[in-house]
């Protein structure tokens, strides 16, 4: 196959030659010249002439779709979405509808509900005299779908009717592509639309209220992986739409955080005590950083993966964390780092998304998590129909109290070594680990026993009679 990049180079050269910036500004003669260049490039790369028989071209296109099932991107997508490899793919062969044959033509992409908020109503974009690729590629600025009504009133009225028919049939929010050719509407495809976690909850509840889904079906519509993000602060959906990530790491602990950059745990603690919201930026974290990690709104590390110290501790504390952003060039001594060609100093504002791993310049407003509204309704329905009890991992009285508030019916695992991460306790714990004699070890144990006894008592009180499974000390030595 010939990669798309070879043809893009030829298109860019032609646009530069003609002094235009958009593909649609090229004339028919320009496109004919480009077609000859494309054929020459194809022969250069493949070694044979480009086939001119339409049937041969069609079969080549079909085979290309089948081959795409094995490309790296498809394999990653299947793995992330639990799609079996054995399914294979299908090819639809259909007559073409042209949206680029003049000003009475156009193309668009639309959702029957807002995929960010879940609000009912048409949401999408439309372009006149264009093909579908132009809408999603960003080469031209599209119009809001509502503006289609002024340009093509009859097609728009028909489109609204079709949207309702499709949503009523599939009983879910639809993501549709369509073309208008000389004023006539052609529907190209529809599918259940992707949506944010918040939108998923609203859509599921609204479909129940509209009589299209049962409560049990609404619960089944929610991807459980999305719920984790809803238990942490989130970026305001409207503000997030306007923001562009400047970097990306691993989404190690969900939630959203924004604040002023600090580079040491001590600074994080000191700034937080003054009422400042801070994001702790480190090459990597260690147990000595625990007080600063607790004081910070979020944690960003250059090194480390999903099981690094920063990731594990942040998840345990419910703190937003992005780890392993190797694009950051860090200078800890001078308290500065470089990302996306810009220098960031102590005190500069930054925002991080622990669910996606995205990093943003500046402050993006956040909204707190709560089991209320649609989230509360969905969880109430889940409780109504579930057959399993749910327990949680909790290692401290604070964790247990929060878990109980969020509906946990006990603790499935309490990792007792996590009780000793605090600065006031970790020294005694290290004494116990490093003791050379039994006497020294028992002396250290005498120091830590009151901490543990107090925590156990507080754990039991927080759980109000619910069960707890205690794991005796099992400390990974590198964490202490």
Language-model-derived ranges and their functions:
Residues 1-240, 276-279, 286-288, 297, ...:
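Nucleotide/phosphate-binding sheet-loop regions of phosphoryl- and nucleotidyl-transfer enzymes
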Residues 212-295, 358-363, 375, 379-383, ...:
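Protease-associated
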Residues 112, 269-271, 290, 339-343:
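Short, surface-exposed secondary-structure edge patches
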Residues 338-341, 368-369, 428-432:
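Short, hinge-like loop/turn segments at secondary-structure boundaries
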Residues 165, 334-340:
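Short alpha-helix capping/helix-loop boundary micro-motifs
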Residues 183, 188-190, 345-393, 399:
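C-terminal domain-closing interface element
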């Amino acid at each position: 196959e010939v990669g798309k990049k070879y043809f893009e180079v030829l298109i860019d050269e032609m646009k530069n030659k003609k002094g235009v910036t958009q593909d649609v500004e090229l004339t028919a003669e320009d496109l004919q010249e480009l077609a000859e260049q494309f054929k020459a490039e194809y022969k250069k790369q493949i070694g044979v002439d480009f086939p001119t028989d339409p049937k041969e071209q069609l079969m080549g296109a079909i085979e290309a779709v089948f081959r795409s099932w094995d490309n790296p991107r498809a394999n990653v997508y299947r793995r992330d979405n639990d799609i079996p490899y054995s399914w294979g793919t299908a090819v639809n062969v259909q007559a073409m509808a042209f949206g680029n044959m003049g000003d009475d033509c156009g193309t668009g992409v639309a959702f029957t509900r807002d995929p960010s908020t879940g609000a009912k109503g048409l949401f999408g974009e439309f372009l006149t005299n264009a093909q579908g690729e132009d809408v999603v590629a960003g080469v031209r600025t599209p119009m809001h779908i509502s503006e289609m009504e002024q340009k093509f009133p009859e097609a728009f009225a028909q489109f609204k009717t079709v949207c309702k028919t499709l949503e009523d049939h599939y009983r879910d929010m639809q993501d549709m592509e369509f073309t208008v050719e000389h004023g006539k509407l052609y529907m190209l495809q529809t599918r259940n639309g992707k949506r944010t976690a918040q939108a998923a909850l609203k859509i599921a509840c609204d479909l129940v209220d509209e009589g299209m889904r049962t409560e049990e079906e609404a619960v089944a519509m929610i991807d459980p992986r999305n719920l984790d993000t809803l238990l942490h602060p989130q970026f305001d959906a409207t503000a997030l739409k306007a923001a562009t990530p400047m970097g990306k790491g691993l989404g190690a602990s969900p939630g959203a955080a924004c604040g002023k950059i600090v580079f040491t745990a001590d600074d994080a603690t000191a700034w937080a005590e003054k009422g400042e919201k801070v994001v702790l930026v480190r090459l990597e974290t260690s147990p000595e950083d625990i007080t600063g990690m607790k004081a910070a709104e979020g944690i960003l590390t250059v090194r480390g993966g999903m099981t690094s110290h920063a990731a594990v501790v942040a998840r345990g504390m419910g703190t937003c964390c992005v780890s392993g952003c190797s694009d950051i060039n860090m200078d800890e001594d001078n308290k500065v780092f470089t990302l996306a060609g810009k220098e960031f100093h102590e005190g500069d504002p930054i925002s991080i998304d622990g669910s996606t791993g995205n990093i943003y310049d500046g402050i993006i407003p956040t909204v707190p998590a709560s089991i209320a509204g649609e989230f509360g309704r969905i969880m109430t329905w889940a409780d109504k129909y579930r057959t399993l009890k749910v327990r949680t991992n909790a290692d401290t009285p604070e964790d247990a109290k929060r878990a109980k508030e969020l509906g946990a019916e006990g603790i499935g695992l309490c990792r007792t070594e996590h009780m000793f991460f605090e600065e006031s306790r970790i020294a005694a714990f290290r004494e116990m680990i490093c003791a050379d004699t039994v006497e020294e070890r028992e002396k250290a144990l005498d120091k830590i026993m009151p901490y543990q006894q107090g925590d156990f008592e507080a754990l039991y009180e927080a759980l109000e009679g619910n069960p707890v499974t205690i794991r005796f000390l099992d400390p990974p030595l590198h964490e202490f």
